[in-house]
Amino acid sequence: MSVELWQQCVELLRDELPAQQFNTWIRPLQVEAEGDELRVYAPNRFVLDWVNEKYLGRLLELLGERGQGMAPALSLLIGSKRSSAPRAAPNAPLAAAASQALSGNSVSSVSASAPAMAVPAPMVAAPVPVHNVATHDEPSRDSFDPMAGASSQQAPARAEQRTVQVEGALKHTSYLNRTFTFENFVEGKSNQLARAAAWQVADNPKHGYNPLFLYGGVGLGKTHLMHAVGNHLLKKNPNAKVVYLHSERFVADMVKALQLNAINEFKRFYRSVDALLIDDIQFFARKERSQEEFFHTFNALLEGGQQVILTSDRYPKEIEGLEERLKSRFGWGLTVAVEPPELETRVAILMKKADQAKVDLPHDAAFFIAQRIRSNVRELEGALKRVIAHSHFMGRDITIELIRESLKDLLALQDKLVSVDNIQRTVAEYYKIKISDLLSKRRSRSVARPRQVAMALSKELTNHSLPEIGDVFGGRDHTTVLHACRKINELKESDADIREDYKNLLRTLTT
């Protein structure tokens, strides 16, 4: 493979990348050919890893196409072109351009004799899985040293080599899950506001809520909505730089950048995106350096009119170990809770998933599953997959009897966890009263209201009849239980404290 082939790829892709991205990641690379192998040198490990993770797929795709199906060998190394014969001497103008690019200075020109650098598709925030590529590491000549090259006469050029054999053209991989869209998101009372806010951001970028902060328990659809926004943004503008990542990835990238003295490249990347989508922001808690860096990144993005979407398992003010200035800024936009789905939504989710799987799910069967799996959408979908698999293996239609067989362990656990006894104990602990108070004839508000809450929870979470529930609450009749349920439903609409208490207890009992 010749350097000319590399240059052809560069010319095809040069216009696809913003100048800042090209200067930061691509221009610092040096290239030389040795036989059928093309050696590409990065100035440090951070740049090498970034090129390998973000750009390799597109780069190999172009090399394969321009090579007319040939299987070229490509080596990524740390260091610079070696000066010993028979290799060509390093190109000084290109090295200078690389140094300027890494320092953030603009590069107006590069010597015409300097090998051009390749550029792939837009960056994403996680390693690109490379399929059909055989990768192996060779021993490095030396460990990475930021001071390498300070004295070229004292030490030979250093390189850590990774050889990549191409077996056909590769497709660029996106880390937005393409299956998560607004079209297949099941909307209900529990997520209606969150869905509406996410759509506003996706359909009117830079004019919606910024930041958009979604919070709630696991498996409730926060990540689905986040991916749906990203996918819609890219649908409207395929050239948009939309980055989705988990907060731990942000921390890992920052640590790597600090270790390799490449924090400026890290900052330039994360502050140049059009939309930054970070999942599970609570993992920043008690990570002071990460919070410091994210604080400045967050400010830079909002000042530049770029969209930020965050998720957490709790309300931002409740995240312990998170700096107050971050909590305050998260409140600049819109904060929306995603609640556990109500019965009707759970049934709708099951019916939609069954339809997507081309499976006939009777409505009474969906209702049976939805009544018993209440905690989150993820567990609901998992239960449905088990039922479908059982139906397929047994060669039987889906019925309530088959559901009982396939989910017997899960249903037994649910019945054990969500018993009236457990509800009484949990409610008593929550309100700091005794179980005997719930069963007593006392009518003081401090006891009567928790008793009504416990009765309402018992009706919603168990299969007991109203008379059975009344019997275990001190021998009360079914009309008392019915009145308690109606009263709590009314208070949930008008009393924020009762609504929050009920939600917390429901989450505790079903998670």
UniProtKB/Swiss-Prot annotation:
Assembly behavior: Oligomerizes as a right-handed, spiral filament on DNA at oriC.
Disulfide-linked positions: none
Subcellular location: Cytoplasm
Gene Ontology MF terms in the entry: ATP binding; ATP hydrolysis activity; DNA replication origin binding; lipid binding
GO CC list: cytoplasm; plasma membrane
Stretches for region Domain III, AAA+ region: 175-391
Name of the molecule in the record: Chromosomal replication initiator protein DnaA
HAMAP family in UniProt: DnaA_bact
Source organism superkingdom: Bacteria
Organism: Pseudomonas syringae pv. tomato (strain ATCC BAA-871 / DC3000)
Function: Plays an essential role in the initiation and regulation of chromosomal replication. ATP-DnaA binds to the origin of replication (oriC) to initiate formation of the DNA replication initiation complex once per cell cycle. Binds the DnaA box (a 9 base pair repeat at the origin) and separates the double-stranded (ds)DNA. Forms a right-handed helical filament on oriC DNA; dsDNA binds to the exterior of the filament while single-stranded (ss)DNA is stabiized in the filament's interior.
Annotated spans, Domain II: 87-174
Biased composition (Basic and acidic residues): 134-144
Notes concerning its domains: Domain I is involved in oligomerization and binding regulators, domain II is flexibile and of varying length in different bacteria, domain III forms the AAA+ region, while domain IV binds dsDNA.
The family this protein is said to belong to: Belongs to the DnaA family.
Keyword annotations from UniProtKB, A to Z: ATP-binding, Cytoplasm, DNA replication, DNA-binding, Lipid-binding, Nucleotide-binding
Residue numbers spanned by region Disordered: 133-160
Region (Domain IV, binds dsDNA): 392-511
Segments crossing the lipid bilayer: none
GO biological process, alphabetically ordered: DNA replication initiation; regulation of DNA replication
Residues holding ATP: 219, 221-223
Lineage: Bacteria, Pseudomonadati, Pseudomonadota, Gammaproteobacteria, Pseudomonadales
Region (Domain I, interacts with DnaA modulators): 1-87
Matches recorded under SMART domains: AAA, Bac_DnaA_C
